[in-house]
From Swiss-Prot:
Residues 262-276, 286-295 have a biased composition (Polar residues). Liver and testis. The gene is FETUB. This is Fetuin-B. Belongs to the fetuin family. The modification Phosphoserine is found at S315. InterPro entries: Cystatin_dom, Cystatin_Fetuin_B, Cystatin_sf, Kininogen_Fetuin_HRG, Prot_inh_fetuin_CS. One of its GO terms (biological process) is negative regulation of endopeptidase activity. Glycans are attached at N37, N136, N182, T289, T292. The keyword Glycoprotein applies. It comes from Homo sapiens (Human). Residues 25-138, 149-255 form the Cystatin fetuin-B-type domain. It is found in: Secreted.
Length: 382
C-alpha cells in the first residue's frame, strides 16, 4: 500500500498536466514567406480586399494593384493566417454601390488615389471558412506636382468642403438639371465626394457627389419642406459646370445603388487566378456566415485613412519610410494572443487561434513584390 499512494499521485499529476491548456511558445519566425504571385496568395488577397470594401461605409472601392508582401502562419488542422501587404488603387465605384472590385473601373492617371493596406486573413480550407480578422489602409492622391509636369492642362483636384462655393455650385446646378429632366422622383445633395477644376473655354468644375431622395415630387414643391427627408444616400452623381462670358454648360449622370439586400455570388468572386478548391470555400462561407450582430464580429475590423499627396507641404518633412504609415496592431505580444473563432464554424465547438503580431519587416524575397496591374511610378508606394 505504501507504494500505491505515490504511484497514484504521479498518475494524477500527469493527468492534470495533460488537461491543462498548452502554453504559448511561439515565435514570429514561424511565419512562412510566400510568393506574391502564387495563385493561392492572389486568391486570398482578393478575398481580403473584397471584405475590406464590404466593411467600409464611405469612400470608393479599392482595387488590387499588386501583392507587396505575403507571409503565412500555418496552424495545422486550424488552417492558416495570412499577413498581407497590398498595394491598392481607388476605383470609380462608391463602396455603397456594393460592386465587386474586379468589376470597377480604374481612374484616369490624374485622378488616381493609391496606397497600401495591411490585412490579417484567416483561411481554413477543410472547414470552408474565410475571415478577415483585421485591416488598415493608408491612401494618398497622386502628386499634383508630378501630374503638372506630365500634363499641365489636366484637371487638378480641389477641396470638397462646403466653404468652396464653386464646388457647391457645380453640384447643385448639375443636380438641378437632373431633377428637371426626371419626371417622378426628386433628389437632394447629400455629400460631395470628389472635386477638380480646369480651364477650358472658361473655368470648369467637375464634381462627384452622393444624393438622397427628396420627400416630394415636382407637384409637391410647395409642401416639400413640411415633410421629413430620408438621409440615406441612394446614388452617386458626376456633374460638371463650365462658364464662359456668354453662357454656362452643365452636364450630369447618376448611378443608383442597389438595395441593401445580401450580395449575390457574382459579387464575391475571387481574383482571376482561382485554385479549384477556393470557390467551394467561398460558396460555403456565404451560406454559413453568422448574423451580422454576432458579438464576436461587432464593430469595425479596421480603417482607411487619407493623407495629402507626397509633394504637399504637410508631407515634406516625412521621409520615404513614413510615406504610407500603415499600422496593424491586433496584438503586440511577441508570443501571440488567442482569438476566439468559434463563431466561424457551423458546428457547435470551441476554437481558438493564436494570432502573431503583424511582421514589422517584409520578407524581402525574390517573388515579392508581385507584378503590378498599373506599373506607373505615380501610383506605386515607395
Amino acid at each position: 500500500m505504501g507504494l500505491l499512494l505515490p504511484l497514484a499521485l504521479c498518475i494524477l499529476v500527469l493527468c492534470c498536466g495533460a488537461m491543462s491548456p498548452p502554453q504559448l511558445a511561439l515565435n514570429p519566425s514561424a511565419l512562412l514567406s510566400r510568393g506574391c504571385n502564387d495563385s493561392d496568395v492572389l486568391a486570398v488577397a482578393g478575398f481580403a480586399l473584397r471584405d475590406i470594401n464590404k466593411d467600409r461605409k464611405d469612400g470608393y472601392v479599392l482595387r488590387l494593384n499588386r501583392v507587396n508582401d505575403a507571409q503565412e502562419y500555418r496552424r495545422g488542422g486550424l488552417g492558416s493566417l495570412f499577413y498581407l501587404t497590398l498595394d491598392v488603387l481607388e476605383t470609380d465605384c462608391h463602396v455603397l454601390r456594393k460592386k465587386a472590385w474586379q468589376d470597377c473601373g480604374m481612374r484616369i492617371f490624374f485622378e488616381s488615389v493609391y496606397g497600401q493596406c495591411k490585412a490579417i486573413f484567416y483561411m481554413n480550407n477543410p472547414s470552408r471558412v474565410l475571415y478577415l480578422a483585421a485591416y488598415n489602409c493608408t491612401l494618398r492622391p497622386v502628386s499634383k506636382k508630378k501630374i503638372y509636369m506630365t500634363c499641365p492642362d489636366c484637371p487638378s483636384s480641389i477641396p470638397t468642403d462646403s466653404s468652396n462655393h464653386q464646388v457647391l455650385e457645380a453640384a447643385t446646378e448639375s443636380l438641378a438639371k437632373y431633377n428637371n429632366e426626371n419626371t417622378s422622383k426628386q433628389y437632394s445633395l447629400f455629400k460631395v465626394t470628389r472635386a477638380s477644376s480646369q480651364w477650358v473655354v472658361g473655368p470648369s468644375y467637375f464634381v462627384e457627389y452622393l444624393i438622397k431622395e427628396s420627400p416630394c415630387t415636382k407637384s409637391q414643391a410647395s409642401s416639400c419642406s413640411l415633410q421629413s427627408s430620408d438621409s440615406v444616400p441612394v446614388g452617386l452623381c458626376k456633374g460638371s459646370l463650365t462658364r464662359t462670358h456668354w453662357e454656362k454648360f452643365v452636364s450630369v449622370t447618376c448611378d443608383f445603388f442597389e438595395s441593401q439586400a445580401p450580395a449575390t455570388g457574382s459579387e464575391n468572386s475571387a481574383v482571376n487566378q482561382k485554385p479549384t478548391n477556393l470557390p467551394k470555400v467561398e460558396e460555403s462561407q456565404q451560406k454559413n456566415t453568422p448574423p451580422t450582430d454576432s458579438p464576436s464580429k461587432a464593430g469595425p475590423r479596421g480603417s482607411v485613412q487619407y493623407l495629402p499627396d507626397l509633394d504637399d507641404k504637410n508631407s515634406q518633412e516625412k521621409g520615404p519610410q513614413e510615406a504610407f504609415p500603415v499600422h496593424l496592431d491586433l496584438t503586440t505580444n511577441p508570443q501571440g494572443e488567442t482569438l476566439d473563432i468559434s463563431f466561424l464554424f457551423l458546428e457547435p465547438m470551441e476554437e481558438k487561434l493564436v494570432v502573431l503580431p503583424f511582421p514589422k519587416e517584409k520578407a524581402r524575397t525574390a517573388e515579392c513584390p508581385g507584378p503590378a496591374q498599373n506599373a506607373s511610378p505615380l501610383v506605386l508606394p515607395p
